[in-house]
UniProtKB/Swiss-Prot annotation:
It comes from Escherichia coli (strain SMS-3-5 / SECEC). Residues 134-147 have a biased composition (Basic and acidic residues). Heme binds at H130, Y134. Residues 30-159 are periplasmic. This is Cytochrome c-type biogenesis protein CcmE. SUPFAM superfamilies: Heme chaperone CcmE (SSF82093). The lineage of its organism: Bacteria, Pseudomonadati, Pseudomonadota, Gammaproteobacteria, Enterobacterales. It is a single-pass type II membrane protein.
Length: 159
């Protein structure tokens, strides 16, 4: 092998190594910014197609309905705890901050946060539904995939 071919081989190897390193770093950076969507039932029993359950500490988005009677507010701070549910199960959520104006018991929400021990979500963001007939698209898609509809929502007679 002559010197010219050797130089070309080294250049090609260096370019491939640089490309592999760049792809690896990009994927590593994106991994920490990806929030996978789950329903409460998928957190409890795993994704239907893969049976993969989320890990403690994983960032995720969870969509479901706020369970009537589950909202508890701390009178001394903005801390709120509530339960969200779907046709297969329920998970507890803690959130510290101002809730959206449309947040109510029996309404659809999507929370974004981290999974903690005991199927508890520490929410960083809470998104509420827009009208009475609205179900978050992710929740509706997941429930259609399960061939189930949301559990019946109990209406507050005072409203």
């Amino acid at each position: 092998m002559n010197i010219r071919r050797k130089n070309r081989l080294w250049i090609a190897c260096a370019v491939l190594a640089g490309l592999a390193l760049t792809i690896g770093l990009v994927l590593y950076a994106l991994r920490s910014n990806i929030d996978l969507f789950y329903t409460p039932g998928e957190i409890l029993y795993g994704k239907r197609e893969t049976q993969q359950m989320p890990e403690v500490g994983q960032r995720l988005r969870v969509g479901g309905m706020v369970m009537p009677g589950s909202v508890q507010r701390d009178p001394n701070s903005l801390k709120v705890t509530f339960t969200i549910y779907d046709a297969e199960g329920s998970v507890d959520v803690s959130y510290e901050g101002i809730l959206p104006d449309l947040f109510r018991e029996g309404q659809g929400v999507v929370v974004q946060g981290e999974l903690e021990e005991g199927n508890h979500i520490l929410a960083k963001e809470v998104l509420a539904k827009h009208d009475e007939n609205y179900t978050p698209p992710e929740v509706e898609k997941a429930m259609e995939a399960n061939h189930r509809r949301p559990a019946s929502v109990y209406k507050d007679p005072a409203s």
